[in-house]
Design a protein with these regions (language model features):
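N-terminal membrane topogenic signal
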Residues: 1-9
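Juxtamembrane and boundary regions of transmembrane helices in multi-pass small-molecule transporters
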Residues: 2-3, 105, 135-138, 142-178, ...
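Transmembrane alpha-helical segments of multi-pass membrane transport proteins and ion-pumping complexes
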Residues: 39-48, 52-61, 89, 93-97, ...
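Juxtamembrane inter-helical linkers in multi-pass membrane proteins
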Residues: 69-81, 170-186, 230-236
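Transmembrane helix-loop junctions in multi-pass membrane proteins
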Residues: 19-30, 56-60, 131-132, 211-222, ...
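Transmembrane helical segments that form the transport core of multi-pass membrane transport proteins
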Residues: 187, 191-261
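Selected transmembrane alpha-helices and immediately adjacent juxtamembrane segments
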Residues: 9-24, 29-41, 45-49, 53, ...
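Alpha-helical membrane segments and immediately flanking helix-loop junctions
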Residues: 74-138, 229-247, 252-279, 288
Length: 322
């Protein structure tokens, strides 16, 4: 009932926005659509199709041959789980969630391993972090190495802290795909699955772009609140606002942007939930893990700033913990 009430309220708010401010609403919708068409569609659709095909044809083991032993030693993952680890760190939101859910549906990993993977493998892509966030928006390309270390080190540390010494079974030994099962029906099914999921992402991106624009119209006179609220809602707009904020220095904007990109936004959480349908994986546990990871990232970023500028780090820490 609570979820239904939230969805109904948001729907009514967006409908009112469309009716009362059609120009601004249409502009926000257009921005979301263009971001989907120019970025998500060409980047994620081929990966959705090919990763689904690899799972269906049991081709994961060849890709993770060298990573699997390390992933098992440090995180207790199965070989199929190490594939999710690899793709979730390389390919961006919400690929980690989709691969986890696909592997659970195909009985390639246990639901327990899927839930564990979901807590740390759904991350921003290196291309988004280094290209858009650090180079285009913040204009801090010199911070690329330390940013990569913080943003990807935090979820790995979170995973290590929450593992509880558990080792997950390798279900790929029990389930193999024979050559007689390989046909164009499998390819067709993978293509349709990819198209369905990429269309869902487009819809969510449009809706959350409209919400972000509405929030900007309502609280635009409060720059720091705008950065935090919009960033927690949708990371692309949040990072753009943070980078352009007149009250934040470059260093403070960098730390806040890492917090935003590590959390992934409620838009990313909604996209993640859409990927989890048909499984028992919980989006609430995912949100708790992302909040913990974002706080770890922010603390490490502030610590890094504190090593060179303590007077700046202390007020920034107070703002983030308020």
């Amino acid at each position: 009932m609570r979820k239904k009430f939230i969805y109904m309220t948001v729907s009514l708010i967006l409908l009112a926005f469309l009716l009362l401010a059609p120009v601004q609403a249409a502009a926000a919708s257009s921005e979301g659509l263009l971001l989907w068409f120019h970025t998500l569609l060409p980047m994620l659709l081929p990966f959705f199709i090919l990763s689904r095909l690899l799972i269906a044809l049991d081709g994961v083991s060849g890709i993770t041959r060298f990573l699997a032993p390390l992933a098992r030693s440090f995180f207790g993952l199965s070989p199929n789980g190490s594939f999710c680890l690899l793709t979730g760190f390389l390919c961006g939101y919400p690929v980690g969630a989709k691969i986890s859910a696909d592997l659970v549906r195909e009985n390639r990993i246990t639901p327990e391993e899927g839930a564990y993977l979901l807590t740390f493998t759904n991350n921003p892509s290196p291309a988004f972090l280094t290209g858009y966030c650090l180079t285009e928006a913040l204009e801090l390309p010199e911070r690329v190495p330390v940013s990569l270390l913080l943003v990807y080190g935090a979820p790995l540390l979170y995973a290590a802290l929450t593992r509880h010494r558990q080792t997950f079974p390798d279900l790929s030994i029990e389930k193999k795909t024979s050559g007689s099962q390989i046909s164009f029906k499998i390819v067709d099914a993978c293509i349709m699955d990819g198209l369905e999921n990429i269309l869902k992402l487009g819809g969510y991106l449009i809706l959350f772009s409209m919400l972000a624009k509405l929030l900007l119209l309502l609280i635009g006179s409060l720059p720091l609140c705008s950065c935090l609220i919009v960033g927690l809602l949708e990371i692309t707009n949040g990072i753009a606002l943070t980078a352009a904020s007149p009250i934040l220095t470059k260093r403070a904007a960098w730390a806040l942007s890492l917090f935003i990109v590590s959390f992934g936004g409620l838009s990313g959480a909604a996209q993640t939930e859409s990927m989890l349908q048909g499984t028992q994986l919980s989006v609430l546990n995912y949100l708790k893990a992302k909040a913990g990871t974002a706080l770890l990232t922010a603390c490490f970023a502030i610590l890094y700033l504190g090593l060179t500028d303590l007077p700046l780090a202390l007020p920034l820490l107070a703002v983030l913990l308020r």
